Amino acid sequence: MANNIPIGSPVRTKAIINRYFVKAKKNLGQNFLVDQDAILGIVEAADIQPGDQVIEIGPGIGSLTEQLLLAGAKVFAYEVDDSLPEILHNELPKKIGEQSLNDRFKLLLKDVLKADFQNDLAGFFDMKQPIKVVANLPYYITTPIIFALSESDLHFSSLTLMMQKEVAERLEAKPGNKEYGPLTISVQTEMNVKIALEVKSTSFMPRPKVDSSVVVLTPLQERPKIENRKHFIWVVKMCFSQRRKTLNNNLKALIPNAKEREALISKLGVDPRVRPEDLTIDQFIEIARNIPAK
């Protein structure tokens, strides 16, 4: 009977935790998702279809993995906790079936930030076809993972990521919003951002201190023309180095000459007293174009 209960249900999760003596590791940011509606919401937000190739980051005890596989996906999972493979290989076949699991699931004990996607996925995924990324991310590595994925050579069609609500709001922020900053600009020059659903802290075991959001990121069809992305990101970060100061003040470190600085601000068509959070992405691109790359 227990085999018919989803891994992500509170009763099954508790049974697995007790059977395998699992303890959520704070240093890995582990919180097990025990809200089946939220789990199915992630699968729906990612628009998982039979045959989809999915990278899952941090499968944990398999709550989301199970539903991805039941939806027909082929799943390649990255995990850093070496105590979890036994659980995944014992529990997933109960609803998926041993043969189907062998054909459609592969687990690699590796930090995704050290991933070599081309080599890791070769032989399991068709690298000519789009790949989806789905993950319930540990809060402490959310931003590094987003940067790593957006800058990788991975041909992905979407990233569906559970993250801290505050980070999700930063990704979706518009100019003039206090959450708008370097992360916002870096992501929005590469991807469309959509918050698909909110997930309360009560949906996790153990319960975190903050709520979460599920964000869907999809590559822009037409990206802004940025000649040197590394230089652009550096300029943006410099402009936000003292975010409560005016643009004119923040630009002093980049353009020491007052007349040159005034000319650029005039070219942007903004008040010198404007703060960086009020500038559009196009205006940041224009600033970067007028500052020599180092």
UniProtKB/Swiss-Prot annotation:
Residues annotated as transmembrane: none
Subcellular location: Cytoplasm
Gene3D superfamilies, A to Z: Ribosomal RNA adenine dimethylase-like, domain 2, Vaccinia Virus protein VP39
An example molecular function term from Gene Ontology annotations: 16S rRNA (adenine(1518)-N(6)/adenine(1519)-N(6))-dimethyltransferase activity
GO-annotated cellular components: cytosol
Keyword terms of this UniProt record: Cytoplasm, Methyltransferase, RNA-binding, rRNA processing, S-adenosyl-L-methionine, Transferase
Enzyme Commission (EC) number: 2.1.1.182
SMART domains (UniProt xref): rADc (SM00650)
Reaction equations catalysed: adenosine(1518)/adenosine(1519) in 16S rRNA + 4 S-adenosyl-L-methionine = N(6)-dimethyladenosine(1518)/N(6)-dimethyladenosine(1519) in 16S rRNA + 4 S-adenosyl-L-homocysteine + 4 H(+)
Ligand binding (S-adenosyl-L-methionine): N31, L33, G58, E79, D111, N136
A Pfam family that the UniProt record links to this protein: RrnaAD
Family to which the UniProt record says this protein belongs: Belongs to the class I-like SAM-binding methyltransferase superfamily. rRNA adenine N(6)-methyltransferase family. RsmA subfamily.
Function: Specifically dimethylates two adjacent adenosines (A1518 and A1519) in the loop of a conserved hairpin near the 3'-end of 16S rRNA in the 30S particle. May play a critical role in biogenesis of 30S subunits.
Name the record gives this protein: Ribosomal RNA small subunit methyltransferase A
Name of the gene: rsmA
